Amino acid sequence: MMRRILLKSIKFYRIYLSPLKRNACCKFIPTCSQYAIDAIEKYGALKGSFMAVKRILRCNPFSKGGYDPVK
Protein backbone atom coordinates (compact mmCIF):
# COMPACT_ATOMS: atom_id res chain seq x y z
CA MET A 1 0.00 0.00 0.00
CA MET A 2 2.79 2.43 0.88
CA ARG A 3 4.54 1.59 -2.37
CA ARG A 4 1.42 2.54 -4.34
CA ILE A 5 1.07 5.87 -2.50
CA LEU A 6 4.71 6.76 -3.16
CA LEU A 7 4.49 5.85 -6.84
CA LYS A 8 1.29 7.89 -7.30
CA SER A 9 2.94 10.85 -5.53
CA ILE A 10 5.92 10.71 -7.88
CA LYS A 11 3.65 10.49 -10.91
CA PHE A 12 1.66 13.49 -9.62
CA TYR A 13 4.92 15.42 -9.27
CA ARG A 14 5.99 14.50 -12.81
CA ILE A 15 2.68 15.53 -14.39
CA TYR A 16 1.71 18.64 -12.42
CA LEU A 17 4.69 20.09 -10.53
CA SER A 18 7.79 19.36 -12.58
CA PRO A 19 6.57 21.30 -15.65
CA LEU A 20 6.26 24.42 -13.46
CA LYS A 21 9.98 24.45 -12.65
CA ARG A 22 12.32 26.63 -14.63
CA ASN A 23 15.40 24.89 -16.01
CA ALA A 24 13.85 21.52 -15.22
CA CYS A 25 16.67 19.41 -16.59
CA CYS A 26 18.05 16.44 -14.70
CA LYS A 27 21.77 15.72 -15.07
CA PHE A 28 21.24 12.01 -14.63
CA ILE A 29 19.87 9.29 -16.86
CA PRO A 30 17.34 8.05 -15.89
CA THR A 31 15.88 11.21 -14.37
CA CYS A 32 15.65 11.39 -10.59
CA SER A 33 11.89 10.80 -10.61
CA GLN A 34 12.25 7.76 -12.88
CA TYR A 35 15.08 6.51 -10.67
CA ALA A 36 12.77 6.81 -7.65
CA ILE A 37 10.02 4.87 -9.42
CA ASP A 38 12.46 2.15 -10.48
CA ALA A 39 14.00 1.89 -6.99
CA ILE A 40 10.63 1.69 -5.23
CA GLU A 41 9.34 -0.91 -7.69
CA LYS A 42 12.48 -3.02 -7.36
CA TYR A 43 13.29 -2.69 -3.63
CA GLY A 44 10.03 -1.64 -1.99
CA ALA A 45 8.90 1.52 -0.25
CA LEU A 46 11.52 1.80 2.49
CA LYS A 47 14.77 0.92 0.72
CA GLY A 48 13.59 2.42 -2.59
CA SER A 49 12.74 5.73 -0.91
CA PHE A 50 16.10 5.81 0.82
CA MET A 51 17.86 5.21 -2.51
CA ALA A 52 15.77 7.95 -4.16
CA VAL A 53 16.62 10.49 -1.45
CA LYS A 54 20.33 9.70 -1.80
CA ARG A 55 20.07 10.20 -5.56
CA ILE A 56 18.20 13.51 -5.21
CA LEU A 57 20.87 14.78 -2.82
CA ARG A 58 23.54 13.93 -5.41
CA CYS A 59 21.64 15.84 -8.11
CA ASN A 60 23.04 19.33 -7.65
CA PRO A 61 24.87 21.97 -9.70
CA PHE A 62 28.27 20.55 -8.70
CA SER A 63 27.60 16.97 -9.79
CA LYS A 64 28.65 15.61 -13.17
CA GLY A 65 25.54 13.49 -13.56
CA GLY A 66 25.55 10.79 -16.22
CA TYR A 67 24.15 7.29 -16.51
CA ASP A 68 23.14 5.98 -13.08
CA PRO A 69 20.52 3.20 -13.18
CA VAL A 70 19.02 1.43 -10.18
CA LYS A 71 21.24 -1.55 -9.37
UniProtKB/Swiss-Prot annotation:
Top-rank taxon, per record: Bacteria
Topology versus the membrane: Peripheral membrane protein
Keyword Secreted: no
Keywords: Cell membrane, Membrane
Xref: Pfam families: YidD
GO cellular-component term (any): plasma membrane
UniProt-listed InterPro entries: Membr_insert_effic_factor_YidD
Protein family membership: Belongs to the UPF0161 family.
Stated role: Could be involved in insertion of integral membrane proteins into the membrane.
Protein name: Putative membrane protein insertion efficiency factor
Origin species: Clostridium acetobutylicum (strain ATCC 824 / DSM 792 / JCM 1419 / IAM 19013 / LMG 5710 / NBRC 13948 / NRRL B-527 / VKM B-1787 / 2291 / W)
Protein location: Cell membrane
PANTHER family: MEMBRANE PROTEIN INSERTION EFFICIENCY FACTOR-RELATED
